[in-house]
Amino acid sequence: MREPLSPHSIVEAAGLLLVTYDDNDKSRPDQFLLMRHRDRWDLPKGHCEAGESLVETALRETHEETGISADDISLIAGFSFSLQYPVTYASPQVVSFTKKVTYFLGWITTARPVRCTEHEGYEWFKWSPPHSIQVETIDPLLTAAAAFFERESRSS
């Protein structure tokens, strides 16, 4: 059972930025997946379960929210990106806490249909940084991922 949340609570979560590679250049992404909530875009992510690592959480949540199996995803070594932000839920009572989300990079060979279980839809976006999607969460992640891919392409 989870402890009651307070404004000082930090809730750990993990997610995955899922990309496909450009057929002509395997060092650069071609597309990336975002999930559609009613009023915003998001990535597959969720809270860590007891005894679960952040990577295990990211892979489990991606499978639960997209239907894409961990067996179909290759994690990209050397990248993680964390951010913290305040969250307030007003139902049934007001609860505030800090969410800390750690994102990892994973690739699959081709963009594919996604089974939406917790979202209204999805889209495979063209990788064309800089991106301007959601300034507080998604844009910083995509900026960090773009810098990572650039460093990796220079070192290969």
Model-derived regions: residue spans:
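Charged phosphate-binding loop/patch that engages nucleotide di/tri-phosphates or the phosphate backbone
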Residues: 132-156
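Short, acidic/hydrophobic/Gly-rich beta-strand patch recurrent on exposed beta strands
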Residues: 33-36
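Acidic, metal-coordinating catalytic segment for phosphate/diphosphate chemistry
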Residues: 1-24, 93-94
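Short connector loops at helix/strand junctions that flank enzyme active sites
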Residues: 11-13, 38, 96-101
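Conserved beta-strand and immediately adjacent loop positions that scaffold enzyme active sites
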Residues: 15, 31, 121
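Unchanged
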Residues: 48-140
